[in-house]
Amino acid sequence: MKKSKTYDIVTIAIVAALYVILTMTPGLSAISYGPIQFRVSEMLNFTAFFNKKYIIAVTIGCMISNFLSFTWVDVIVGGLSTLVFLSLGVLLFDRFKEDYFWNGQLNKAFFFFAIFFSISMFTIALELKFVAETPFLLTWGTLALGEFASLFIGAFIMDKLGKRVDLSR
């Protein structure tokens, strides 16, 4: 069966909405913003390894979620950072998608991506340095650790989900 553009738009909208919900839900929103953050929604980055259209979905979800942050600059910087580094990460690590660590428990592509994307938090640390006058290295460190933790946990969840639900459509 051939997919329609409508189907693609709807699935992109659903993933973007899930990102927003997992970021802005009371309780989760308290840990989703600022120099120390743990965004549960970041696990949705891995949907892009199943279908590249989800790069747009996650970027849109990130930008909408960042409207709740303390500055509109975060909408632009966070959105562009997500678009660029998610695209690069999929391009660099997609070839490891079928390889695993720990007897098939941890997808290598997801693990390498988690490290790469955590390092990319320098963009958000720079933003916070200029907008909120936070110390760059400390902020980068806390952002990278939070990002890695959320992606590492999300890697297990999304890999298992991807084996049960066809995320490639």
From Swiss-Prot:
Subcellular locations according to the entry: Cell membrane
Membrane-topology annotation of the record: Multi-pass membrane protein
Broad class of the protein's primary localization: membrane
InterPro entries: QueT
Keywords, comma-separated and alphabetical: Cell membrane, Membrane, Transmembrane, Transmembrane helix, Transport
Residue ranges of the TM segments: 9-29, 44-64, 73-93, 110-130, 137-157
Family, per entry: Belongs to the vitamin uptake transporter (VUT/ECF) (TC 2.A.88) family.
Function: Probably a queuosine precursor-binding protein that interacts with the energy-coupling factor (ECF) ABC-transporter complex. Unlike classic ABC transporters this ECF transporter provides the energy necessary to transport a number of different substrates. The substrates themselves are bound by transmembrane, not extracytoplasmic soluble proteins.
Description of how the protein assembles with itself and partners: In E.coli forms a stable energy-coupling factor (ECF) transporter complex composed of 2 membrane-embedded substrate-binding protein (S component), 2 ATP-binding proteins (A and A' components) and 2 transmembrane proteins (T component), probably with a stoichiometry of 2:1:1:2. May be able to interact with more than 1 S component at a time.
Protein name, UniProt field: Queuosine precursor transporter QueT
Annotated source species: Lactococcus lactis subsp. cremoris (strain MG1363)
Gene name linked to the record: queT
